[in-house]
UniProtKB/Swiss-Prot annotation:
Entry similarity comment: Belongs to the NusG family.
Keyword Signal attributed: no
Protein name: Transcription termination/antitermination protein NusG
Ranges where the KOW domain occurs: 131-163
Keywords assigned by UniProt, alphabetized: Transcription, Transcription antitermination, Transcription regulation, Transcription termination
Gene Ontology cellular component terms for the protein in this record: cytosol
Gene3D superfamilies linked: 2.30.30.30, NusG, N-terminal domain
Organism encoding this protein: Staphylococcus aureus (strain NCTC 8325 / PS 47)
Length: 182
């Protein structure tokens, strides 16, 4: 199977059951601390909303579509492979044929199907923001803070906003759906 070297692809990673959220957080922290943002792009836990009606009341819960697995979008290099494999809670890549062999990526149609099930699609967000514009953060720990867009990372669907904290401008990383343009 010939594969483009340096191509951004999706891989399925096996985790301890119930550790998906921890693995996602750990991996995202490792990507930042090890300067791997140019090789490891997104970590997604496949899940979907399920609505059940009990006693006449609808209750919506989020259910993991593939318990024990997370999807990681990355460029497969020795370094990115090492970072993911050695993240606490990760037991290995799916499609790896044995010790030392790199895994096969998921097929694009498989990824599209999974992301569509989650309501994500292969995120193509039309960003009508520019560096220097003022935005309000709608959710998260910095909700209702107003700041200036410092950096836009369309491939990760994140942006860096400078907010005033304790009299200093502090960069805060937020996702596109967490902000609104002023």
């Amino acid at each position: 199977m010939s594969e483009e070297v340096g191509a951004k692809r999706w891989y399925a990673v096996h985790t301890y059951s119930g550790y998906e959220n921890k693995v996602k957080k750990n991996l995202e922290k490792r990507v930042e601390s090890m300067n791997m943002t140019e090789q490891i792009f997104r970590v997604v836990i496949p899940e979907e909303e399920e609505t059940q009606v009990k006693d006449g009341k609808a209750k919506t819960t989020v259910k993991k579509t593939f318990p024990g697995y997370v999807l990681v979008e990355l460029i497969m290099t020795d370094e990115s492979w090492y970072v993911v494999r050695n993240t606490p809670g990760v037991t290995g890549f799916v499609g790896s044929a044995g010790a030392g062999s790199k895994p096969n990526p998921l097929l694009p149609e498989e990824v599209r199907f999974i992301l569509k099930q989650m309501g994500l699609k292969e995120k193509t967000i039309d960003v009508e923001l520019e560096v220097g514009e003022q935005v309000r953060i709608k959710s998260g720990p910095f909700a209702n803070q107003v700041g200036e867009v410092q950096e836009i990372e369309t491939d990760k669907f994140k942006l860096t906003v400078l907010v005033d904290m304790f009299g200093r401008e502090t960069p805060v990383e937020v996702e596109f759906d967490q902000i609104e343009k002023l």
